[in-house]
């Protein structure tokens, strides 16, 4: 079982007892807390994407927006704050759920008269099941790609730190 799955399982566990002989659910929760000390945005992103906890969405969006402002300044882009906020929000939404809204990630069109799929590929995503980032943002694709990569990097750092904490625990 991977680190993400183990942490997700620990978060819904009813048994938070400590066991000195083996790793228990509480150890994985501790590890995520330790990992959050070095990578707090990674924990926010984990909660948003994998734990489906949208309570920190506004705070996460503010963080993504501030990253976008800094990078846009370094790239010397002339973009309004409203457009930059929209780009940050669309990039975050795409990062959290990149699946095609038309086919719900299945890649095929649904029959309108029955709860089943047709053999025709989805016209929105061309059978991929997910939409490319270009479809989520209107302009400044390079900035959006950088933001998505930064989100992946923060998430990866958080997972690696949590995994290391459980291995050395």
Feature-to-residue mapping (PLM):
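Short cysteine/histidine-rich zinc-coordinating motifs and their immediately flanking basic loops
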Residues: 112-120, 134-141
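Long, charge-rich boundary regions
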Residues: 130-169
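N-terminal alpha-helical interaction blocks
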Residues: 1-87
């Amino acid at each position: 079982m991977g680190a993400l799955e183990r942490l997700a399982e620990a978060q819904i566990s009813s048994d938070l007892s400590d066991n000195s002989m083996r790793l228990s659910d509480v150890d994985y929760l501790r590890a995520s807390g330790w990992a959050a000390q070095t990578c707090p945005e990674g924990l926010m992103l984990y909660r948003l994407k994998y734990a489906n906890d949208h309570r920190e969405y506004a705070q996460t969006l503010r963080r993504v927006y501030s990253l976008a402002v800094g990078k846009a300044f370094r790239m010397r882009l002339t973009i309004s704050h409203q457009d930059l906020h929209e780009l940050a929000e669309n990039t975050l939404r795409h990062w959290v759920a990149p699946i095609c809204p038309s086919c719900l990630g299945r890649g095929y069109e649904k029959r309108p008269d029955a709860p089943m799929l047709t053999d025709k590929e989805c016209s929105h995503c061309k059978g991929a099941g997910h939409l490319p980032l270009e479809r989520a943002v209107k302009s400044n694709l390079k900035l959006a790609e950088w933001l998505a990569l930064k989100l992946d990097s923060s998430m990866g750092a958080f997972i690696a730190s949590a995994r290391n904490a459980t291995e050395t625990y």
